[in-house]
Amino acid sequence: MRTLWIMAVLLVGVEGSLLEFGRMIKEETGKNPLFSYISYGCYCGWGGQGQPKDATDRCCFVHDCCYGKLWSCSPKTDIYFYYRKNGAIVCARGTWCEKQICECDKAAAICFRENLGTYKDEYQSYGKSRCTEKSLKC
């Protein structure tokens, strides 16, 4: 019950591209992004350290690196627009930053879909304190 309350509180503060990213994840994987990816492994969710636990966690590591290259943008709050054409995500309209944030999110959502077969429930709600190996560099 406490976990649900914490997630509800987090949702209240979520805006901008995080909502769009969540929708992309749901569309690509069929999974609820809050329950499946928000604290998966060592890199999914806020922050990241250590070694990615599996291919899904590596998607999050690469996503973090992608956001890191956008130092002049606000990836978690800038709102972007996307649509689907023949099933594919198309990042559309907006500023350079908005389009780049969308491309980062698109790549991660596709990566999650491509690695659904390696997704492990044991890495859901994985404590970052358990990620003690030397961190990777982007």
UniProtKB/Swiss-Prot annotation:
Covalent S-S links between cysteines: C42-C131, C44-C60, C59-C111, C65-C138, C66-C104, C73-C97, C91-C102
Residues annotated as the enzyme's active site: H63, D105
Cofactor: Ca(2+)
GO BP of this protein: arachidonate secretion; lipid catabolic process; negative regulation of T cell proliferation; phospholipid metabolic process
Span of the signal peptide: 1-16
Subcellular location field: Secreted
UniProt tissue specificity: Expressed by the venom gland.
GO CC annotations on file: extracellular region
Top-rank EC class of the record's enzyme: hydrolase
Keywords linked to the UniProt accession: Blood coagulation cascade inhibiting toxin, Calcium, Disulfide bond, Hemostasis impairing toxin, Hydrolase, Lipid degradation, Lipid metabolism, Metal-binding, Platelet aggregation inhibiting toxin, Secreted, Signal, Toxin
Catalytic reaction annotation: a 1,2-diacyl-sn-glycero-3-phosphocholine + H2O = a 1-acyl-sn-glycero-3-phosphocholine + a fatty acid + H(+)
EC number annotated for this UniProt entry: 3.1.1.4
Cofactor binding remark: Binds 1 Ca(2+) ion.
Main location: secreted
Residues that coordinate or bind Ca(2+): Y43, G45, G47, D64
InterPro entries associated with the record: PLipase_A2 (IPR001211), PLipase_A2_Asp_AS (IPR033112), PLipase_A2_dom (IPR016090), PLipase_A2_dom_sf (IPR036444), PLipase_A2_His_AS (IPR033113)
Molecular function GO labels: calcium ion binding; calcium-dependent phospholipase A2 activity; phospholipid binding; toxin activity
PANTHER family: PHOSPHOLIPASE A2 FAMILY MEMBER (PTHR11716), PHOSPHOLIPASE A2, MEMBRANE ASSOCIATED (PTHR11716:SF9)
Similarity remark: Belongs to the phospholipase A2 family. Group II subfamily. D49 sub-subfamily.
Subunit structure and binding partners: Monomer.
UniProt function note: Snake venom phospholipase A2 (PLA2) that impairs hemostasis. It weakly inhibits ADP-induced platelet aggregation when tested on platelet rich plasma from human and rabbit blood (15-25% of inhibition at 5-10 ug of enzyme), and dose-dependently inhibits blood coagulation, possibly by inhibiting thrombin activation. Exhibits strong hydrolytic activities toward L-dipalmitoyl phosphatidylcholine. PLA2 catalyzes the calcium-dependent hydrolysis of the 2-acyl groups in 3-sn-phosphoglycerides.
Listed name of the protein: Basic phospholipase A2 Tbo-G6D49
